[in-house]
Amino acid sequence: MQINLLNDFIKAYENTYSVSFDDSFKGRIQELCKELNEPFMHASYALENELKELVFSLDKNVNIAIIGQFSSGKSSLLNLILGRDCLPTGVVPVTFKPTFLRYAKEYFLRVEFEDGSDIITNIEKLAFYTDQRNEVKQAKSLHIFAPIPLLEKITLVDTPGLNANENDTLTTLDELKNIHGAIWLSLIDNAGKKSEEDAIKANLELLGENSICVLNQKDKLSAEELDNVLNYAKSVFLKYFNELIAISCKEAKDEQSYEKSNFQSLLDFLTQLDTTVLKEKFVKRKILNLCEILEDENQLFVGIFDRLLNQFQSYEKHLLLAYENFLKEIEILNHQILEQLKSISERISSEIFASVKEKDAYFYKESKGFLKKDLYTRYDYKAPYISSDDAFLAMFYNSDVMSKEFKKIKNELYKSFEEIKMKLKDFINILEREILLFKAEFSNIQKDHIFQSDKNFSELRAFCNASDEYFLKDFKELLFKSILELDLFFEKLNLKAFTNYENATKLSLAFFSRKINESRVLYELDSSEFVLFYPKKSEIYERVLNELNVYEFETLLINKPILTKIAKNFLEQSQNLIQEKNKFLDLKKAELQKRRAQILNVRESIKED
């Protein structure tokens, strides 16, 4: 069952994506369109339709647009081509929707409405649907069908005047995107004027490679004036068009002045157009334009990922530059902590040493000799002693000087640890600020062209929205772990040393008090063999060092410094995380590189064709 499902999936995939085409121009275009529509390209629905339309366009008529300023005579020109007055003429803007002139055996009109409906009606109804003064159902486009041989291979597109109104202008520009060539119609009075040239430049990319500039109303000029105007107009306009001619629609209406009108030159130009070449150039131009749009998208994504890579590069550089000083500060702190522990030990040992006193003591010993049997001799001596309770009370309760000093040292140490933690946080805050700025800038990014990939942009938005999850979470976990290790070490230091000084003092006092008492017992047993124990200051100091665990902390601070280890581990782990993030971003860029290679392959193939 599962094998059958898998085989069905593979077969469906091959039917969709493993299609082969012949070696004709159309077949090669189909192959290139398929490459742009590969699954990993994530083509938008609009792009898929555009690619299909490009292939279909090779079997359709070429579209030649009639473009010109309002009242330049476009309707009159098209009426001459149609052989009858179909399009209304006059001073009122009437051609408010694009109008297509197509071939049919009879004259009729098809009106396509904005709601998707359409009607077919008599050609005489055209004026009703084109007059802006009429309140009619919103039309999307008008299609005039006429039995004109020229229209068998060519569809003429009448566009609204460029300066009729803002909406007409926008519509005109939109319609120009789907034409193979254009007739730029201009009044001969405007020939060579800057305003006219500016309008041409604004639409230059949309004119195609087979366009003609037609100057209307040549009947207004004398032969000499016409030559001068043509020479000047050609010097200005011919760089934009294949050909430039002057006609007179007025003269072309009259059979007797038709030849003089030069209208036939325009018809000859249209008739002699190589429609196959036009279609091929059009498709090539459109595919190159699509490649440019997709490449722009690709470069945008590369730039976004490069920004993250640069941020991590800058962050790592900052870490390395700052960490040398940071480690030096920690090394200094290690020695400071050790010196503070020794200072506390020195202070306690001095107080204990000062509390060692002497007192009068005596003991009895059985007298020797026959006559002294059962008699005892008293021996007086000076005995060392420590009143542990009195000494302890004197140090910590009768006076709070030492307690205040130790508390001050502890607070200073706490601040030092907090400063270390703050510096670690500052490192992460630098990265966090950059990542959050990145998220804010790109989390709602939208495509700026309909042919760009919806899926790619959707995934990019999701990626940017989750950038803190992708790029901050691990660093924050590392920070949390490092701070926890610092807190644990501080707590250990605090419990075993800085809050243990009273207990260490008690233990030290008890130790020396016991040793003194033991020495007295031995001394009283045999004063010739044993001596009284008077603790030296160095002995007391060593004992306090042990009770305060100073030697243990000396190992943890100097020989195998825990703080330095935590700091170095933070740096090493940060660098490892940066490498991981860079690899992750490189994988993202590898996907983009694969798409870019596909785009470049299509671009090079279309240029070679």
Curated annotation (Swiss-Prot):
Residues 216-219 are annotated as: G4 motif. CDD domains: DLP_2. Residues 158-161 are annotated as: G3 motif. Keywords: Cytoplasm, Hydrolase. It comes from the Bacteria. Residues 17-25 are annotated as: Linker. One of its GO terms (molecular function) is hydrolase activity. GO terms for cellular component: cytosol. GDP binds at S72, G73, K74, S75, S76. Residues 93-95 are annotated as: G2 motif. Forms a 2:2 heterotetramer with DLP1. DLP2 forms a central back-to-back dimer flanked on each side by a DLP1 subunit. In the crystal structures the 2 DLP1 subunits are in very different conformations. The 9 residue linker permits DLP1 (tethered to DLP2) considerable flexibility; it is long enough to allow the GTPase domains (dynamin-type G) of DLP1 and DLP2 to heterodimerize. Two regions within the tip of the trunk are required for homodimerization; deletion of residues 348-401 and 509-542 prevents DLP2 dimerization, but not formation of a DLP1-DLP2 dimer. This is Dynamin-like protein 2. The lineage of its organism: Bacteria, Pseudomonadati, Campylobacterota, Epsilonproteobacteria, Campylobacterales. The gene is dlp2.
